[in-house]
Curated annotation (Swiss-Prot):
Domain Protein kinase: 35-293
Gene designation: WNK6
Active-site residues, Swiss-Prot/TrEMBL: 183
Catalyses which reaction(s): L-seryl-[protein] + ATP = O-phospho-L-seryl-[protein] + ADP + H(+); L-threonyl-[protein] + ATP = O-phospho-L-threonyl-[protein] + ADP + H(+)
Binding site for ATP: 116-119, 166
Name the UniProt record assigns to this protein: Probable serine/threonine-protein kinase WNK6
Enzyme Commission identifier(s): 2.7.11.1
Length: 439
């Protein structure tokens, strides 16, 4: 019979000395079960990860040491809260969350010690850098696993937000392609629905993190940046010089230059839905239903099934309102060819029209209510090979300074128009009921 497995204490003021017979061992945990080697396998601004060994199970593990700041060390209340959060993280059991074997607070050395399972293939950034040619099918599998892990974290009561999700903190087993979310050094249990402290890696931080409040949807934004890095092999905002320039772009809503390098409209649309404003951003449970992740063929499109587009939150003003469709005479020409009709779509006070032509780009005309209550008109080209409804509507909302809830309405009208002239078009948002116009 195996002896009972010892468990590390939550708090340890003194560390056992390393075994004399092994000079490579730097220290042991309070129970003596886990032995930390001197070999460093990862590091960050406040954390160092070492290779370690589980003497009971005979397996290699990872031992992370996270520095505790002065504010926590000087408060018994904060220390107790830290221990409570560590206990909760130890209780997490999910196939896409890195297993946490033991953890304890070392008050003398002012560190939190965390022992986890070891992934020998490293993190996703290292793996993607090593393997340049990765099919989108594999990246979709990674994305689904990451979102499944986030869905689990966010479904806890209260929800757990990671706050520092990035490719460095997602670990992969190269033998079977399994990925797990790890490095919970900044993870936080949401004692309230809103929180106010700012921590994380700036390139992956959602804009609302710089404001007063945020919730678990900041992890979805970070996931979108992870997807962007996976697809392009380029760190978001690598075009910027320094923290201030990145901060300015994020707070002004300017997306990374790498996004323009994503040529596949469906992939780009999925990433953009993750990077949408917080009021329009979908939770992990909804993103897992997206057509992009449901498709399994090499071109990530299925011709044998009809997928429901991602549902996008709408303003109550336009909720459930149908799109009225009509044809209007047009005596103009496109590329020298006569166009006898234009397609007109109207939803509430928004009107979109364009020629019944599949010539690329499609010229569209939009009539919409401006912030001052007066109707405004704008004409714009839509590149069916490069643009998505969401990328264009987001740009229009930003450039024209429209309310955020206009975004899904405009995207829906664009997708509805394109479905009429190109039935194979894959919409980014849910297209509601379309009815013939009486006028």
């Amino acid at each position: 019979m195996m002896p009972p497995k010892p468990a590390a204490e939550d708090v340890a003021d003194e560390q056992p000395e390393p075994p004399d017979e092994d000079p490579d061992v730097a220290e042991a945990d309070p129970t003596g079960r886990y032995l930390r080697y001197r070999e460093i396998i990862g590091s960050g601004s406040s954390k160092t990860v070492y290779k370690a060994f589980d003497a009971v199970d005979g397996i290699e593990v990872a031992w992370g040491k996270v520095e505790i700041n002065e504010r926590i060390m000087g408060s018994s209340k904060e220390l107790q809260r830290l221990r409570t959060e560590i206990q909760l993280l130890k209780s997490l059991q999910h196939k896409h969350i890195l297993k946490l074997y033991a953890s304890w607070v070392d008050t003398n050395r002012r560190t939190v010690n965390i022992v986890t399972e070891l992934f020998t293939s490293g993190n996703l950034r290292e793996y993607r850098t090593k393997h340049k040619k990765v099919d989108m099918k594999a990246m979709r599998r990674w994305a689904k696993q990451i979102l499944t892990g986030l869905e689990y974290l966010h479904s806890q009561k209260p929800p757990i937000i990671h706050r520092d999700l990035k490719c460095d903190n997602i670990f992969i087993n190269g033998n079977h392609g399994k990925v797990k979310i790890g490095d919970f050094g900044l993870a936080m249990v949401m004692q309230q629905r809103k929180t106010r402290s700012i921590q994380g890696t700036i390139e992956f931080m959602a804009p609302e993190l710089f404001g007063e409040n945020y919730n678990e949807l900041v992890d979805i934004y970070s996931f979108g940046m992870c997807m962007l890095e996976m697809v392009t092999c380029e760190c978001p905002y690598s075009e910027c010089k320094g923290f201030i320039q990145i901060y300015k772009k994020i707070t002004e809503g300017v997306k990374p230059a790498a996004l323009s390098k994503v040529k596949d409209a469906e992939v780009r649309g999925f990433i953009e839905s993750c990077l949408a404003s917080v009021s329009d951003r979908l939770p992990a449970s909804e993103l897992l239903k997206s057509p992009f992740l449901q498709s399994d063929d090499a071109n990530h499109r299925s011709s044998n099934s009809v997928q429901e587009p991602v549902k996008f939150p709408e303003n109550n003003f336009t909720k459930d309102e149908p799109i009225f469709v009509s044809l209007a005479p047009n005596n103009g020409t496109v590329n020298g060819k006569e166009q006898s009709f234009i397609l007109v779509l109207q939803k509430s006070d928004f009107l979109l029209e364009g020629n019944m032509s599949t010539t690329n780009p499609v010229m569209l005309f939009l009539r919409f209510p401006g912030p001052d209550g007066k109707f405004k008109n704008v004409q714009f080209p839509f590149d069916m090979e490069k643009d998505t409804s969401l990328s264009v509507s987001t740009e229009m909302v930003e450039q024209l300074e429209l309310p955020e809830w206009n975004n899904p309405v405009l995207a829906e009208l664009i997708d509805a128009f394109l479905l009429h002239i190109l039935p194979s078009w894959k919409p980014c948002v849910k297209v509601g009921k379309m009815l013939p116009s009486s006028s």
